[in-house]
Amino acid sequence: MENRKILIVNTLDGGQYSAELESLLQEKEAEFKIINSDAMNISHCVGCNHCWLKTPGVCVFNDDYLLILKELVTSDEYWVVSDTSFGFLSSRGKRVFDRLMPLLLMYLELSEEGLMRHKLRYGRSIDVGIVFKGDGNREYLQRWCQRTALNLAGKPLGVFDVNEIKEAVSCM
């Protein structure tokens, strides 16, 4: 069986837990890339729809997110390691999800489950997982992860506290 390509974006200060993730994934002989985004310049999505209408597949912001987007185009799994705020992902964590829009088309379709989702720009689904630090509302994060995976025509891989990092890696 061919290894799936795993992209992990770690938004925590100083790339906390990246070394542990790397060690566990090397033991598993997984194909992966970890991007520590804490010092990267990543703008918020402003919902301008340029990536759909004016410059298809290209965000209007020419910032460091382009490095993540280039990796995502060929990835099978997208994992985000994020701090939490008010039970949800921190602004850094939410930002790296919001900027996924260039991977999608503005057109909608029904999924096999009968739910609406955007059509994929590159015809490639991406499975989604979250590792959170802090007081995350796991139930809400799981539901949000499911909806995000659905929009990427992928599967939710799970939502894990940083203390469950081994369990998260077992799902990668």
Which residue stretches match the model-derived regions?
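Short, acidic/small-residue loops that bind anionic groups at enzyme active sites
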Residues: 100-115, 154-159
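Short hydrophobic beta-strand segments
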Residues: 6-9, 127-134
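Glycine-rich phosphate/pyrophosphate-binding loop and the adjoining helix
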Residues: 136-172
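A generic local structural motif
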Residues: 64-67, 114-118
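N-terminal beta1-alpha1-beta2 submodule of the flavodoxin-like/Rossmannoid cofactor-binding fold
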Residues: 1-78, 82, 86-105, 161-172
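Short, glycine/serine-rich, charged loops/turns that create anion-binding
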Residues: 12-13, 135-137
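A generic structural motif
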Residues: 84-85, 134-136
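Short, conserved loop/helix-junction motifs that constitute active-site signature segments
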Residues: 118-125
